[in-house]
């Protein structure tokens, strides 16, 4: 059954928002949100430059450089990821009730020789039917998350760092790219070549595409009664 089962946040947060938006991650942890309808009107009406300003200017909840930003399929918000192995889930509605629903969490970390190693989250992708999302990291892991339950649904372990992720339009498959992003120590030959923690080297000759089934893997888990 491929029917949507995504249940957005409850309370005063809108259940759906059909405003066409463009969300841009800027330098300095800034996030600009544009209303595409307003931009279209400004273009065709010959409006002054001030009309092309973002509808919202925000500061990211994450403390370090952003790596990716993705909008929720129901239009109510977006998620950002950072080089510090954290993800933030935020909402366009500026009311206090809606903003109280935003949150951030850490992921894509593991202990290596007694040290907590943090990996960047290079890419994310929202499932078009369920509203769950995937995060692809430099630790060669892809995690599937339920943003409502705030839990991980599933995790894949790939051979080398992940650089891109995308669900197809029907949500049947998840495509992952590995090997294109790697730390500097992966750029040399020898037995020690590879990512921190023994992850396989990226770079030329290691780029691969991985196709994962998504209709069942990305479906939110039913709540226990």
Model-identified regions with their sequence ranges:
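WD40-repeat beta-propeller superdomains and closely related acidic/aromatic-rich repeat-like regions
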Residues: 1-225
